[in-house]
Amino acid sequence: SLKHLSQKINKKEQEDDLYRIFFYDCAPLEKKMHNPISGKSIDFSKSEEAIFRRDLHQKLIKTRKLALRLGKLSEKSAKWIFKPEIAEKILKKQIDIKSVGENDVTIDVRQKGVDMRIALDIASITFKKQANRIVLVSGDSDFVPAAKLARREGIDFILDPMWQKIPDDLFEHIDGLRSTY
């Protein structure tokens, strides 16, 4: 977020230079699968999410000072699962599995390589001294080893968890916490 470029120090507005914004994602699921409940064929390449993400990626690669880093989607491991709230109700015997409908399942697919790309970029920026501050906008803690490395090398490491609560032990691995939106 560009709002991280300005901050108040001693009640004065300070602007930082932007080295680059790195955007990490993976291509959307493009395969066709059949819903296990209804048997209906679903072409995920035509879903609203797939269309949105392809369009977003095209816009991002044309944006100045922005690097799009794409991991891989593990399409072979894509499988149908019960939505978490449905699985919980089945396990608690609140609903019978025979009453499950086609909208009670969702596709489960994993992205590969995104965490590694984040860590490599943080390490590269750190060792090449391309920035003195890194702001990571993330909702998970997979970045901890890279953040530790950056901090040991003198980088001011800020986490923007997008207003999500973070575990207390995560504070020891960052220099600051700041959500902007």
What are these regions (language model features)?
Residues S1-K89, E102-I107, I155-D156, P161:
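Domain-level signal for Mg2+-assisted phosphodiester chemistry and nucleotide/NA-binding surfaces
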Residues L70-Y181:
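Nuclease catalytic cores that cleave nucleic-acid phosphodiester bonds
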